[in-house]
Amino acid sequence: MINFDGIKKITERLKWKQGDEDENWAKKAIDNLMKKLIKHNKQALENLEFALRCQGQQKTECVTIPRSLDGRLQISHRKALPHVIYCRVYRWPDLQSHHELKAIEDCRFCYESGQKDICINPYHYKRVHATGVLPPVLVPRYSEKPPQEVPPTLAKFQLMEMSGSRMPQNVNMANVNFTANQFHQYNPNGIEEMDTSQKFDIPPGVPTCLVPFDKVWEEQFWATVSYYELNTRVGEQVKVSSTTITIDGFTDPCINGSKISLGLFSNVNRNATIENTRRHIGNGVKLTYVRSNGSLFAQCESDSAIFVQSSNCNYINGFHSTTVVKIANKCSLKIFDMEIFRQLLEDCSRRGFDASFDLQKMTFIRMSFVKGWGAEYQRQDVTSTPCWIEIHLHAPLAWLDRVLSTMGPTPRPISSIS
């Protein structure tokens, strides 16, 4: 018996939509599909339900609909190829064109076959890399909230039980001269002042990547935040210790560790676009760092959206590493997961220095205010946005450094002409 509700309700679990996508586009696409299958191919409806339930774990049959005159299907005034539409609805929300899809060998009615029926089974296609295609800006449909704070006494008990040691208490952020008129060209490779050479008490014989991260990193500062206008860093880098910090556009001079007011940062070379953008930052963003597991959440407090590029977040959701996520007012999203980083580090450490070193890209997060960048914007890079920040996460960077220091050098030859 066909479970119509099961096929429809799967959209309720779809977390993402593309930035220019109508809120009900996926639902309309599924309603359209239901009508076509009921009219032309009821058996295919059962095949679709089975395919969605198995999620590619078992072999499934083709799910076909009639090919239109131009091969495309119209949903909400937008035309696209049907297999692209339903692969996007059910599997890859960041999918943009048929150039990113390739049919599996068992698919008898794939789009490329040119037959009168087209298979739209999303598990009969696999994703391929398409050169020259910028990933779309994606918008979460639902918020991810940070976990509730554990009472201090319970947290202490749990930590002693887990690692035999206690995490240090938060301390106030070090004094920073916010108004220092110092400008630096953007350096994509990182932090200037962070020391990752500390010695850690790790039991002999235990691979560093398998040690709980609280044993590897016990410093009071969990991140360093840099503020940029276009490709120029403005002011000093700010080390962060408070587990909850607000970065806003106001001018609060209080340095209490829980707020960074970008309105205090001065730049004599600021243009009108930057000035106007700064006026709209407002309440900005609230960052919540969960010390117990190393995860980081961002909640947009501004009336204008914030735009986030986190390769860790993108990996979790199966997106291209350079994908930009748009977070609207009052929406919250996990932008870093330490457990995922640990799993990747464990895997990469077995594959050598180069694979492990590449994970340093996951230790920093870029975030712009008000103005976005990417496929749907005239700005193709974060350094073209008026106001943005870069967040360097200390714990994963120190953990990675510890692993790299136990490895030999890269096998790639290097010379003056390499």
UniProtKB/Swiss-Prot annotation:
Classification via PROSITE patterns: MH1 (PS51075), MH2 (PS51076)
Protein localization: Cytoplasm; Nucleus
Record-annotated MH2 domain positions: 222-418
One BP annotation, GO: post-embryonic development
InterPro entries: Dwarfin, MAD_homology1_Dwarfin-type, MAD_homology_MH1, SMAD-like_dom_sf, SMAD_dom_Dwarfin-type, SMAD_FHA_dom_sf, SMAD_MH1_sf
Mutant phenotype after disruption: RNAi-mediated knockdown enhances tail tip morphogenesis resulting in retention of the pointed larval tail tip in adult males (also known as the Lep phenotype) of sma-3 e491 mutants.
Residue intervals of the MH1 domain: 8-134
Entries under Pfam families matching the protein: MH1 (PF03165), MH2 (PF03166)
Keyword annotations: Cytoplasm, DNA-binding, Metal-binding, Nucleus, Transcription, Transcription regulation, Zinc
Binding site for Zn(2+): C62, C107, C119, H124
GO molecular function: DNA-binding transcription factor activity, RNA polymerase II-specific; I-SMAD binding; metal ion binding; RNA polymerase II cis-regulatory region sequence-specific DNA binding
CDD domains: MH2_R-SMAD
Gene3D superfamilies: 2.60.200.10, SMAD MH1 domain
GO cellular component: cytoplasm; heteromeric SMAD protein complex
Membership in a protein family: Belongs to the dwarfin/SMAD family.
Job of this protein: Involved in TGF-beta pathway. Plays a role in male tail tip morphogenesis.
Protein name: Dwarfin sma-2
Gene that specifies this protein: sma-2
